[in-house]
């Protein structure tokens, strides 16, 4: 039989004995929710000020509470605070210490408040602040890509589909593709900040409170646009956490694709880019190795972010309104994802700025795999008036001939091309170089250097306002 213990002093009036040791272990969240100490104190300071302003507590009690909370914040920041698992969570740890510091006045702080709305406001504040940090990190990554895109607006390289050579593009154009991706990520972050900007403080356990509180006052004090409108939803909601994990997972997908390309491109077989020693490691047995570990670790860490999203979706999917203890498991998922996303974005921004681009290798590869075949087909349509499907067929025969002769399309003789279609003229050879190919792609959003530079100008203006 388990040893009987005294019940928790914060909620134990109903209980004759304390929790079993294993219950104490599974119930405690202080091991991870101590990360919310600053937000918890911030919320309590706002709540106490409101209670005093509305006459719910005396001014002297408010002053003691305020001073005590500031003392606790300093103790935590200086590493002098002792966290107790017996007190379950960050809220009770702080309240218990407040009682030690100021006595009975500490018991007035929780008037018109429940841990349900307390943790909801703490967590919202933390996620909101993390979203702002993510936005700043994404801006930095986008700026890194803009720098490289401007530098390589005319650097030709192969574009791929199915990882097979498709058409020539420029490295600048490829960089701008990632600007678009991370730009959408930044937009999602901004949208999430707009939706999270409501304060649940004052919703109490689930039904609101009979005390004459001022929720607009606390919302304003905490930097929220307004209070939430339904007390039941306020304490039941974790959409903001799921939305953070969702946008983090999408961003992680972009980071992982980029990491994969860096890994591939840095192989001797591609040799498109080279990472410096700052973002590489060696082998314990093979002295010649220089491994792109930073990119590989970004690729792996993004998988953890996906896992966090699935975990919280699964936790929340079957919960009745309002609060259930299951929701205690939300924080570790978000904390882990936020830490890994921040690290991955920062590492990738460093790698993008660090990359040495092998222009010669890119240009050589750009002309391989008959990458200008589409240019031949387009010339047949524009110049000879062939329907595109017929031009496609003629070009396919030309590729087959070049392949049998083991030469590029531009190395076929005019006579050989005319054996496929007699109307072909020598003019066509001017359209079969990779430089001509990329310059011709002047459609809006295309890979022509002048169009890439237009994209860069657009994003520089947009990111300056983001």
From Swiss-Prot:
Q: What is its EC number?
A: 4.3.2.1
Q: Where does it primarily localize? A: cytoplasm
Asked if the keyword Lyase belongs to this entry, the reply reads yes
| Single GO molecular function | argininosuccinate lyase activity
Q: What is this protein called?
A: Argininosuccinate lyase
Q: Which UniProt keywords apply?
A: Amino-acid biosynthesis, Arginine biosynthesis, Cytoplasm, Lyase
Q: Where in the cell is it found?
A: Cytoplasm
BP GO annotations: arginine biosynthetic process via ornithine; L-arginine biosynthetic process
* Catalysed reaction, written as an equation: 2-(N(omega)-L-arginino)succinate = fumarate + L-arginine
């Amino acid at each position: 039989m388990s040893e009987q213990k005294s019940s928790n002093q914060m909620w134990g009036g109903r209980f004759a004995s304390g929790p079993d040791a294993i219950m104490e272990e599974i119930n405690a969240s202080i091991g991870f929710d101590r990360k919310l100490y600053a937000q918890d104190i911030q919320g309590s300071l706002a709540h106490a000020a409101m209670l005093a302003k509305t006459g719910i507590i005396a001014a002297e009690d408010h002053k003691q509470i305020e001073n005590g909370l500031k003392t606790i914040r300093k103790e935590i920041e200086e590493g002098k605070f002792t966290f107790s698992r017996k007190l379950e969570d960050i809220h009770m740890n702080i309240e218990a210490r407040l009682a030690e510091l100021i006595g009975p006045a500490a018991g007035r702080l929780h008037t018109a408040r429940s841990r349900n709305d307390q943790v909801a406001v703490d967590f919202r504040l933390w996620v909101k602040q993390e979203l702002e940090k993510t936005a700043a990190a994404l801006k930095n990554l986008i700026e890194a890509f803009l720098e490289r895109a401007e530098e390589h607006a005319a650097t030709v390289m192969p574009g791929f589909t199915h990882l097979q050579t498709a058409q020539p593009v420029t490295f600048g154009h490829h960089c701008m593709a990632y600007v678009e991706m991370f730009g959408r990520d930044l937009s999602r972050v901004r949208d999430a900040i707009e939706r999270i900007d409501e304060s649940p403080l004052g919703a109490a356990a689930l039904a609101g409170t009979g005390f004459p509180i001022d929720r607009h006052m606390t919302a304003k004090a905490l930097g929220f646009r307004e209070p939430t409108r339904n007390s039941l939803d306020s304490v039941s909601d974790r959409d903001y956490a799921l939305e953070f994990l969702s946008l983090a997972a999408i961003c992680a997908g972009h980071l992982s694709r980029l990491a994969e390309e860096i890994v591939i491109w840095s192989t001797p077989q591609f040799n498109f880019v080279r990472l410096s020693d700052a973002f590489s490691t060696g082998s314990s047995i093979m002295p010649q190795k220089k491994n792109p570990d930073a990119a590989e670790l970004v690729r792996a860490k993004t998988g953890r972010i996906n896992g966090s999203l699935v975990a919280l979706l699964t936790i929340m999917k079957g919960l009745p309104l309002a609060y259930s203890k299951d929701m205690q498991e939300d924080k570790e998922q978000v904390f882990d994802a936020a830490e890994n996303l921040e690290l991955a974005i920062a590492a990738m921004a460093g790698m993008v700025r660090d990359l040495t681009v092998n222009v010669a290798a890119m240009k050589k590869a750009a002309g391989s795999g008959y990458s200008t075949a589409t240019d031949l087909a387009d010339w047949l349509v524009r110049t000879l008036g062939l329907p595109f499907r017929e031009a496609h067929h003629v070009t396919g025969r030309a590729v087959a001939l070049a392949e049998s002769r083991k030469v590029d399309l531009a190395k076929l003789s005019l006579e050989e091309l005319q054996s496929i279609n007699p109307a072909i003229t020598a003019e066509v050879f001017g359209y079969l170089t990779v430089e001509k190919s990329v310059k011709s792609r002047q459609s809006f959003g295309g890979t022509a250097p002048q169009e890439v530079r237009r994209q860069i100008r657009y994003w520089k203006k947009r990111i300056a306002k983001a």
